[in-house]
Every structure is written in structure tokens, then in C-alpha cells.
Amino acid sequence: MTHQTHAYHMVNPSPWPLTGALSALLMSSGLTMWFHFNSLILLTTGLVTNILTMYQWWRDVIRESTFQGHHTPVVQKGLRYGMVLFIISEVLFFTGFFWAFYHSSLAPTPELGGCWPPTGINPLNPLEVPLLNTSVLLASGVSITWAHHSLMEGNRKQMLQALFITIALGVYFTLLQASEYHEASFTISDGVYGSTFFVATGFHGLHVIIGSTFLIVCFLRQLKFHFTSDHHFGFEAAAWYWHFVDVVWLFLYVSIYWWGS
């Protein structure tokens, strides 16, 4: 084997991109089967495949970064660029949902009764659960920043406390969102209002679940002393993602819950 004379990480062949793509296909097909035929077999298979892929891919990345030292400063720089581009792509993803919402609400068609919210839709009160959700996410933004500063100062105990609080707030937000969906007087099939509301807030809810999973992995890694004050990009990426989720919610709250009601 030739000796490596550069700082770049030559990644070994991995099956996880393939199994990840397969799980995405199974989940999207499974959602269609669930919506139209009330069958959960494909969706469950896709979710299990996705969870197994996440576990094994995270395990490999942790092994390469923490135990094999492949994440040199130049590799970390590349990962930072990658994470920034990923968050930009997510911003554009949500831009499409906001576009659909404003396109429908600023010039309501006669079929909607020429008004917004459409005739027959009883929107959620923005000063009840949505406002509580806003305060929960803003508080989690404060606690994740506290965790980050504690980590940079080498205060392990406070970092774990702050990270645990952030995860708890993320789970609480998800439970509040689920209860709100359960109690809503309209559904995703109630015209353009129902579809834009549930798709935009639902995808944001999915991002909160993904972000919470990301933070739980960081919490478990910190318990095992994986992070140092100057080598913790895994946590930094999770914190960036969480702040992005916070900001998107503020736009959702102001646009869909407050102005849209």
C-alpha cells in the first residue's frame, strides 16, 4: 500500500448511500400506499431500512473522524462548505412552500370564495399552541448556543446539561405539533389552505425530528468523550442545522399562523 502524502480523506467504498437511496424509495412509495390503500408494510420497511442506514453510516463517520483521525483541518473545511450548501438547499426547498402559500393567499381564486382563509376553513389561533411552539424553539436556540459555548470552554457538565435541555425542548415541540394536528378542524385534503399548511408545517416538523436525532447522537458522543474544545464539527453542524430550523419556524409562524389566519 502506498503512503498517503496529502491531508485529504480518501473514503472507502460504502454501501450506505445505496441503502439510503433504497430506503428513500421505500418510504416515498410506502407513503403513497398508506395514503391510497391504507397499507403500512412498505412504509415500515422503508423506515426500518432508513434507521439501520443512519446507525451504520454514523458509526462509520465516527470511526473515521474520532478513532482514525481522517478529519484533518482541510477535510473539516470541506465538510463545513458541504453543510453550508446543504442548508442553502434546504432554504430553497422551503422557499417553494412559501411561494405556494403566498401565490394562493395573496390572490384567492373565486373557488376559495375570493377570501383567505378560504370559506369554511377555521384556522388555528396563532396566540395559543403556535405561540407556545415559537417560545419552545426560541428557548432551544438559546440552550444549543449555551451548549456550544460550554464545549468551547471545556465545560463538559454544562455542555451535557444544555444539550439535554435542547433535545427535551425539541421532543416537546414535536409532541405539541402532533397534538395540534390531531385537534385541527381541517385536513391536508381541504383545498389549497390545508395542503400548503400541512406540507409546510409538516416538513418543518420532520426537520425538527431530524435535528433532534442529530443532537441525540451528539449527546451520546459527548458522553463517550468524543468532542474536544477545538475538534467538534459534528456538534457544530448539528447546531447550525438547529438554528436553521428555528429561523424557518419564525417565518412559518409569521406567514402561515399569524398573517394567514
Swiss-Prot record:
Molecular function, one GO term: cytochrome-c oxidase activity
Enzyme class, broadest EC rank: translocase
Keyword terms of this UniProt record: Membrane, Mitochondrion, Mitochondrion inner membrane, Translocase, Transmembrane, Transmembrane helix
EC number: 7.1.1.9
One biological process term in Gene Ontology: mitochondrial electron transport, cytochrome c to oxygen
InterPro entries, alphabetized: Cyt_c/ubiquinol_Oxase_su3 (IPR024791), Cyt_c_oxase_su3_dom (IPR033945), Cyt_c_oxidase-like_su3 (IPR000298), Cyt_c_oxidase_su3-like_sf (IPR035973), Cyt_c_oxidase_su3_a-hlx (IPR013833)
Main location: mitochondrion
Mitochondrial intermembrane face of the membrane: 35-40, 106-128, 184-190, 257-261
Residue ranges that the UniProt entry lists as topological domain Mitochondrial matrix: 1-15, 67-72, 153-155, 224-232
PROSITE patterns: COX3
Protein role: Component of the cytochrome c oxidase, the last enzyme in the mitochondrial electron transport chain which drives oxidative phosphorylation. The respiratory chain contains 3 multisubunit complexes succinate dehydrogenase (complex II, CII), ubiquinol-cytochrome c oxidoreductase (cytochrome b-c1 complex, complex III, CIII) and cytochrome c oxidase (complex IV, CIV), that cooperate to transfer electrons derived from NADH and succinate to molecular oxygen, creating an electrochemical gradient over the inner membrane that drives transmembrane transport and the ATP synthase.
Protein family membership: Belongs to the cytochrome c oxidase subunit 3 family.
Protein name: Cytochrome c oxidase subunit 3
Organism phylogeny: Eukaryota, Metazoa, Chordata, Craniata, Vertebrata
Name of the coding gene: MT-CO3
